């Protein structure tokens, strides 16, 4: 409380020195209650000058709107009957410090009322007495200002004197702080709503990476701050750069701004909270940098649907989306303003200057000399006929601000002066705090038919129209602003109406990273949530969502674009497969040959050749060869439990039986001749019965092992998805097979291969047997060839383990190897004998037998020969 008198005395002294009462320009209207008005009639002046060029729309249109509204209020018998509203309208020159000086005139009467009342102390600069000595009006409320920085400066003074203030254009969120600006209200929504609308627009366009551009000051900085805060809370939008345009930009400043924006070229969307001059100079710098069409502007209400910021810069503005508080053109004001002339509008002291500017003429010549460069005004010119005219966008809000004060005064008058016409003592003077209470309580339909009301912070509800500047027939200069949507707590944006450079119907991107393709996940860049790298879901992984890749289940493989999983195809070797053709052909031919030979031997069972071959072991060997050929059919058949059991049992049985018989034969021959070198006593176990016992004894080990395996692990078919899980998922197959691994399969053959190797060793040892003993050498050749076949089999079988055709190659290799080994035994041991039996029966005589017998006698005692003869 102690600081207020000091401040008041300081203000009184400043007023006496400032010359405010000394002819400073203002519009005055007499009335019982005076309203103040602050309008940017002139632009900010250059260095050393307070004011610059006249602002026809933002300045004169808005000022005339207040005069129009006052005329309407004063002419309304139902509103404030008996009370006439006066006015004191001042020019802020678009500068906050100058506006503060002007606004001090609103509190002049209050200061002098609290001071010593010595009006003689008021002097103009140089000691000249004031032109008017009438006491200043007592202002009850103020309409204005326009710029947020000006409103903030003025509000700090008006609140000290409890003078309510209603702005028609100030939207800075800072002004919503009722603890600091408790006497401030506005009929336009704050930028926090506007910022929310702009965030919604950015999200609707699919942008996630934008830059912000703000004019230094409360409006620009607060607007951007609100946008950044809301976008952070909403998520999904990142700020590439936040650039501030200095209040007094240096030469080249705007080129520097453009260069900075191009440091993040993917952030094409530019959120701009800037005054008209800055908007224009940014567009000019864009043109000079040859970047027309690169930036995608989203402008605040300071841009709105105005022509002045983009005049002659339409190419750079094409596609710009702008926001404007929802408004309507007031027809009554158009009729009022278009009938204004120099004769009927003398109350507006700036109207003559407007007339010259609007019609490009001069009312008087400088220095009394005629000026040939500019025509002279006739005074008969008409607005809208001899000059272009379009109602300025804030006219509606100026009118609504005046009516809000009028309605509040009316309600206050009804409460304090019931039944009284004109002002009563309770309203002389008018208490500002009481008036503020009634202002915050007003609710009426404004000049455009929309509700006018205030919340507890003095803010109006957020309602915006959304525009886009579009070219017409490919020409930007003949284009215009097209309404594309609305915002009232939620966005309604008509995407079909939007038009863009390049492809008119495709929204240009403003993203840090391009969208990932199908089957790719986003790998976020640390610290920049809107930037990412695209990582392919390779191998057997598929895209779960935009951030995650997961492996497909074991029985599935990814789709070609890796966006999902699909069943892995199941394959097996079928009867019709080309891979089965050769094995089946060999097996059929082998079985036919084996059957023919066995039948031939059985038919000629007692002939010398058959007897000399060892009939018992020959039949065992032929049976083993038959089983080897037969296994091919089991390997091609569709796997099931029975087939799998038969495979286990017969896969090694045929080879074991064959090689057991050959081993027994080879061992017998070797032992006979080795024994013959040392003694005439025959070796043991060389009789046919002994040979059969040895053969079946060796074979029984294989049978017992397989039976034990069947009991321990019952056979069944499985689909093996790992066997054909190739690097390329497109080549992956599930293999329907018996539950036998490659090693298990080789294990089935392992014992028979051991017998084969042992037999080969004996065949090598018996290679010195006399040539007349014809069984040893064919057996030797058979075993050598068989070893070569199986040596070739192993690398082929295991070398194709990762092949996409593994199931076919391995099965074919195995069956062909078995058939070839059986064919070698059949061809070398029995085909020659069968040939002799069938085609040269004259050789199948005792002589042949004698030859064999003679050979045997060389290595065996006479009694063994007799035994052979007994056979």
Curated annotation (Swiss-Prot):
Binding of L-glutamate, residues: 148, 169-171, 219, 301, 394
Region Disordered, residue ranges: 850-871
GO biological process: adenylate cyclase-inhibiting G protein-coupled glutamate receptor signaling pathway; chemical synaptic transmission; detection of light stimulus involved in visual perception; G protein-coupled glutamate receptor signaling pathway; gene expression; locomotory behavior; positive regulation of calcium ion import across plasma membrane; regulation of synaptic transmission, glutamatergic
Main location: membrane
Disulfide bond annotation, renumbered to this chain: 51-93, 238-530, 361-377, 417-424, 512-531, 516-534, 537-549, 552-565
Tissue expression pattern: Restricted expression in the inner nuclear layer of the retina.
Alphabetized CDD domains for the sequence: PBP1_mGluR_groupIII
Topology with respect to the bilayer: Multi-pass membrane protein
Secretion signal, residue range per the UniProt entry: 1-23
Any one GO CC term of the record: cell tip
Glycosylation site list: 290, 445, 473, 561
Extracellular side: 24-579, 638-648, 713-742, 801-813
Keywords recorded for this protein, A-Z: Cell membrane, Cell projection, Disulfide bond, Endoplasmic reticulum, G-protein coupled receptor, Glycoprotein, Golgi apparatus, Membrane, Receptor, Sensory transduction, Signal, Transducer, Transmembrane, Transmembrane helix, Vision
Entry's transmembrane regions: 580-602, 617-637, 649-667, 692-712, 743-764, 778-800, 814-839
Compartments, as annotated in UniProt: Cell membrane; Endoplasmic reticulum membrane; Golgi apparatus membrane; Cell projection, Dendrite
GO molecular function, one term: adenylate cyclase inhibiting G protein-coupled glutamate receptor activity
Chain ranges on the Cytoplasmic side, renumbered to this chain: 603-616, 668-691, 765-777, 840-871
InterPro entries named among the record's database cross-references: ANF_lig-bd_rcpt (IPR001828), GPCR_3 (IPR000337), GPCR_3_9-Cys_dom (IPR011500), GPCR_3_9-Cys_sf (IPR038550), GPCR_3__mGluR6 (IPR000112), GPCR_3_C (IPR017978), GPCR_3_CS (IPR017979), GPCR_3_mtglu_rcpt (IPR000162)
Function: G-protein coupled receptor for glutamate. Ligand binding causes a conformation change that triggers signaling via guanine nucleotide-binding proteins (G proteins) and modulates the activity of down-stream effectors, such as adenylate cyclase. Signaling inhibits adenylate cyclase activity. Signaling stimulates TRPM1 channel activity and Ca(2+) uptake. Required for normal vision.
Similarity comment text for this entry: Belongs to the G-protein coupled receptor 3 family.
Subunit structure: Homodimer. Interacts with GPR179. Interacts with photoreceptor synaptic protein LRIT1 (via its N-terminal extracellular domain).
Protein name per its UniProtKB record: Metabotropic glutamate receptor 6
Gene expressing this chain: Grm6
């Amino acid at each position: 409380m102690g600081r207020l008198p000091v401040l008041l005395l300081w203000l009184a002294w400043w007023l006496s020195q400032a010359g405010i009462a000394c002819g400073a320009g203002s519009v005055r209207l007499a009335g019982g209650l005076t309203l103040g008005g602050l309008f940017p009639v002139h632009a900010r002046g250059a260095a050393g000058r307070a004011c610059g060029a006249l602002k026809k729309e933002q300045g004169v249109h808005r000022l005339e709107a207040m005069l129009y509204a006052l005329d309407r209020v004063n002419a309304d018998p139902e509103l404030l009957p008996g009370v006439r509203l006066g006015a004191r309208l001042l020019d802020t020159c678009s500068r906050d410090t100058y506006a503060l000086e002007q606004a001090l005139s609103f509190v002049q009467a209050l200061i002098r009322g609290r001071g010593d009342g010595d009006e003689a102390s008021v002097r103009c600069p140089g000691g000249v007495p004031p032109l008017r000595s009438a006491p200043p009006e007592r202002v009850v409320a103020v309409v204005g200002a326009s710029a947020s920085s000006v409103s903030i400066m003025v509000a700090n003074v008006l609140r000290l004197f409890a003078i309510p203030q209603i702005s028609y254009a100030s939207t800075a969120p800072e002004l919503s702080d009722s603890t600091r600006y408790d006497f401030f209200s506005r009929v336009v929504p704050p930028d926090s709503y506007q910022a929310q609308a702009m965030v919604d627009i950015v999200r609707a366009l699919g942008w996630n990476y934008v830059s912000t551009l703000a004019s230094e000051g409360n409006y620009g900085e607060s607007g951007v701050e609100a946008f950044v805060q809301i976008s952070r809370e909403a998520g999904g939008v990142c700020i590439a750069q936040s650039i501030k345009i200095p209040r007094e930009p240096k030469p080249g400043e705007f080129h520097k701004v453009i260069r900075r924006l191009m440091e993040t070229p993917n952030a094409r969307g530019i959120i701009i909270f800037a005054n008209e001059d800055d908007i224009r100079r940014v567009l000019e710098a864009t043109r000079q940098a040859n970047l027309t069409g690169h930036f995608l502007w989203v402008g605040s209400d300071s841009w709105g649907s105005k022509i002045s910021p983009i005049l002659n810069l339409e190419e750079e503005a094409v596609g710009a989306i702008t926001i404007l508080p929802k408004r309507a053109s007031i027809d009554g004001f158009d009729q009022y303003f278009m009938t204004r002339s120099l004769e009927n509008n003398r109350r507006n002291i700036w109207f003559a200057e407007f007339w010259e500017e609007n019609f490009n003429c001069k009312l008087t010549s400088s220095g009394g000399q005629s000026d040939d460069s500019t025509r002279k005004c006739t005074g008969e010119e008409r607005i809208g006929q001899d000059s272009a005219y379009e109602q300025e966008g804030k006219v509606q809000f100026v009118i609504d601000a005046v009516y809000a004060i009028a309605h509040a005064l009316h309600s206050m008058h009804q409460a304090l002066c019931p039944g009284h016409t004109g002002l009563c003592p309770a309203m002389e003077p008018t208490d500002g705090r009481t008036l503020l209470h009634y202002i915050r309580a007003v609710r009426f339909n404004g000049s455009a038919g929309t509700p006018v009301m205030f919340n507890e912070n003095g803010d109006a509800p957020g309602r915006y129209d959304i525009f886009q500047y579009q070219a017409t027939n490919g020409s930007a200069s003949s284009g215009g602003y097209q309404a594309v949507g609305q915002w009232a707590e939620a966005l309604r944006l008509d995407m079909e109406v939007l038009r863009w450079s390049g492809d008119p119907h495709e929204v240009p991107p403003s993203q840090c990273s391009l969208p990932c393709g199908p089957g790719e996940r986003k790998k976020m860049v640390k610290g920049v949530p809107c930037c990412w790298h695209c990582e392919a879901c390779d191998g057997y992984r598929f895209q779960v969502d935009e951030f995650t890749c997961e492996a497909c289940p074991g029985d599935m493989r990814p789709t070609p674009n890796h966006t999902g999983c699909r069943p892995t195809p199941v394959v097996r070797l079928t009867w019709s497969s080309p891979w089965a053709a050769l094995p089946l052909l060999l097996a059929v031919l082998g079985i036919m040959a084996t059957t023919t030979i066995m039948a031939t031997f059985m038919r000629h069972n007692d002939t010398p050749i058959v007897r000399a071959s060892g009939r018992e072991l020959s039949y065992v060997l032929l049976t083993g060869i038959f089983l080897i050929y037969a296994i091919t059919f089991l390997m091609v058949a569709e796997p099931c439990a029975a087939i799998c059991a038969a495979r286990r049992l017969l896969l090694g049985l045929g080879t074991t039986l064959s090689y057991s018989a050959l081993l027994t034969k080879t061992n017998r021959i070797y032992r006979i001749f080795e024994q013959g070198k040392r003694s005439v006593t025959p070796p043991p176990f060389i009789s046919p019965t002994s040979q059969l016992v040895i053969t079946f004894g060796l074979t029984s080990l294989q049978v017992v092992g397989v039976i034990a395996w069947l009991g321990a692990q019952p056979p069944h078919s499985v689909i093996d998805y790992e066997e054909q899980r190739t690097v390329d998922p497109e080549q992956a197959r599930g293999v329907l097979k018996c539950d036998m691994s490659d090693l298990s399969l080789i294990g089935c053959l392992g014992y028979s291969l051991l017998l084969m190797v042992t037999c080969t060793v004996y065949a090598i040892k018996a290679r010195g047997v006399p040539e007349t003993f014809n069984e040893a050498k064919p057996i030797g050749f058979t075993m050598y060839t068989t070893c070569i076949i199986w040596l070739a089999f192993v690398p082929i079988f295991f070398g194709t383990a990762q092949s996409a055709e593994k199931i076919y190659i391995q099965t074919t290799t195995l069956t062909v190897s078995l058939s070839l080994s059986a064919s070698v035994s059949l061809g070398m041991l029995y085909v020659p004998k069968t040939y002799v039996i069938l085609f040269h029966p004259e050789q199948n005589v005792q002589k042949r037998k004698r030859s064999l017998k003679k050979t045997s006698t060389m290595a065996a005692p006479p009694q063994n020969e007799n035994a052979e003869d007994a056979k």
